[in-house]
């Protein structure tokens, strides 16, 4: 998003030759966020490895802080946004099935939930 440090990702899908799902490792610098969206086809699982991942789900958004060792599942068609609202970089694993891309509907961003 404009004005924030870039996020980075590594494709686990490519490295492991996944066929029926997609997986990525993400790094979010301090105070960055992904785009708010809903995916009609894909269920997603998020697992923080380092730091607290904030996920806004539903509409109106509900804030869920996910710590390392916790897991959050976002079902198909559910509005969501992944965020790092901390002063430290976070690292998390994201897994989705089926392995579709390009169908997400992007939504207006919200400041706080």
Residue ranges, per PLM feature:
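A generic "binding-loop/recognition-motif" signal
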Residues: 32, 41-42, 60, 78-79, ...
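Residue-level recognition of conserved beta-strand positions in structured domain cores
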Residues: 25, 38, 49, 57-59, ...
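A short, N-terminal "cap"/entry segment at the start of jelly-roll beta-barrel domains
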Residues: 1-25, 35-36, 104-113
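Short beta-strand His + acidic residue motifs that chelate non-heme Fe in jelly-roll/DSBH
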Residues: 35-36, 55-56, 64, 74, ...
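A generic beta-sheet turn/junction motif
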Residues: 16-18, 29, 40, 59, ...
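A short beta-strand-loop-beta hairpin characteristic of the jelly-roll/cupin
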Residues: 42-68
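Double-stranded beta-helix
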Residues: 3-6, 81-113
